[in-house]
Amino acid sequence: MEAERAAKVGIASALLVLAGAAIAAYGLDQFSKFLVVSNLTEGEIVPVLGSALQWQFVRNPGAAFSLASGMTWIFTILAAAVITFIVWFARRIRSIAWAVVFGLLLGGVLGNLTDRLLREPSFGLGHVVDFISTPWLIPAIYNFADIAIVSSMVLFMILTIRGIGLDGNREVRATAATPAAAASDATASDAAASGGRAFSAGPELARES
């Protein structure tokens, strides 16, 4: 194994990228929800690209993509725990890509947590505003916070598969030797084989003499 340097940055740059991604995701999520609540009635469907993309205002008491309804308080606690972990863990990040991962996750989780804390019916039990409907893709209705969370998970898997660490270094396997090294190995093998044959032929020559 050998280390290959990826997009490695200092702690200040990594935190700046993380904060930027989080602010962008959170801002887009909250602004879009403000427009939806201000301009649509609950349950209303507005075609954007026919039936492929629609706005449909619903209030979701569950998790992302309207899953596990009725467990709002559990997701509120989990979201707060995730945010606390990211803030604590952020100083270890030295990679731009990983900073984007945690930034998108932070912004998305914070966006839905804001709804659960501040929206009806009560503090900590608020319903999340969902409005993006793509029936051809998934039956659930979601929002930009959900998109940010899923995007962070996809990027997380890509970075993990590629072996890129939090420090920005990538571990790669030496799958093939260089031509010079291969030629050197072949020469050494031939020499060893020739020496072995000469050694084994020695006793036979002695017996014949």
What is the meaning of each model-derived region?
Residues 1-209:
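Alpha-helical transmembrane bundles and membrane-interface segments of multipass inner-membrane proteins
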